Amino acid sequence: MTNQYSILFKQEQAHDDAIWSVAWGSNKKENSETVVTGSLDDLVKVWKWRDEKLDLQWSLEGHQLGVVSVDISHTLPIAASSSLDAHIRLWDLENGKQIKSIDAGPVDAWTLAFSPDSQYLATGTHVGKVNIFGVESGKKEYSLDTRGKFILSIAYSPDGKYLASGAIDGIINIFDIATGKLLHTLEGHAMPIRSLTFSPDSQLLVTASDDGYIKIYDVQHANLAGTLSGHASWVLNVAFCPDDTHFVSSSSDKSVKVWDVGTRTCVHTFFDHQDQVWGVKYNGNGSKIVSVGDDQEIHIYDCPI
């Protein structure tokens, strides 16, 4: 337990190229936590976080091109990765073996996300569709069509009701998952939406854009509830803290910022990376943040809780 923000651990040369994505899960059996990273070096790496340090568990080979997105199942020891090779791969975190490879088709799979029940994997495509794959079947179950541009980012709401997508032209779409209907189209940004994240109570959606702004939306009414500035360049990633009170952002200005949801203010900035920071995530209880970037490093920070 700590009462201030500080950098706790640095893994230098974690990959041989830029690290574009990170996920954080917990291993209940071993009382340890798992960090998964995806890099332009074509590798997915699985790290164990225990005793305040990272140990490399598996280096997963299979992708033919850079890995752009990783996620960890909420229910099983499985990770998913998507790559510029247009394949999604599922990995067993307990033995480091590939479970299956899914051909995402001629349109690149970009960001991917497990559904809250982890039975599905959603991924955005170049043609404005969100494709939903069955984790068990490995097949495309259905698509949601934004009728828009290349989808860079997607997120499920934790309550399983909504799926949000962010496109290269700054348009955000929110779908009702049960009906497949498009509920809201939000036009708050004029530049690519790199990342979006729902609050744990599914009431708010936070969006990150190349315009340098972070926006907070009230999901139910699609109202803009806040515009936050502070990053000096593109905002590349946002992730909510499990306690609903804070979220974290990362940017090509090389910084990681922690924001207070209630006051809409930045409460801490980390300047520890040497290059743009592509990915940030909280751990399960919100006591730690992980960040990854073009400097090939993984950083773990302590948060006051």
From Swiss-Prot:
InterPro entries according to UniProt: G-protein_beta_WD-40_rep (IPR020472), SKI8 (IPR051510), WD40/YVTN_repeat-like_dom_sf (IPR015943), WD40_repeat_CS (IPR019775), WD40_repeat_dom_sf (IPR036322), WD40_rpt (IPR001680)
Subunit: Component of the PAF1 complex, which consists of CDC73, PAF1, LEO1, CTR9, RTF1 and SKIC8. The PAF1 complex interacts with PHF5A. Within the PAF1 complex interacts directly with PHF5A. Component of the SKI complex which consists of SKIC2, SKIC3 and SKIC8.
Gene3D superfamilies from the UniProt entry: YVTN repeat-like/Quinoprotein amine dehydrogenase
Superkingdom of this protein's organism: Eukaryota
GO-annotated biological processes: negative regulation of myeloid cell differentiation; nuclear-transcribed mRNA catabolic process, 3'-5' exonucleolytic nonsense-mediated decay; rescue of stalled ribosome; transcription elongation by RNA polymerase II; Wnt signaling pathway
Subcellular location: Nucleus; Cytoplasm
Modified residues (N-acetylmethionine): 1
CDD domains: WD40 (cd00200)
The name this protein goes by in its record: Superkiller complex protein 8
SUPFAM superfamilies (alphabetical): WD40 repeat-like
Entry-annotated residues carrying N-acetylthreonine: 2
Record-stated family: Belongs to the SKI8 family.
Sorted UniProt keywords: Acetylation, Cytoplasm, Nucleus, Repeat, Transcription, Transcription regulation, WD repeat, Wnt signaling pathway
Provenance organism: Bos taurus
Gene this chain is encoded by: SKIC8
Function: Component of the PAF1 complex (PAF1C) which has multiple functions during transcription by RNA polymerase II and is implicated in regulation of development and maintenance of embryonic stem cell pluripotency. PAF1C associates with RNA polymerase II through interaction with POLR2A CTD non-phosphorylated and 'Ser-2'- and 'Ser-5'-phosphorylated forms and is involved in transcriptional elongation, acting both independently and synergistically with TCEA1 and in cooperation with the DSIF complex and HTATSF1. PAF1C is required for transcription of Hox and Wnt target genes.
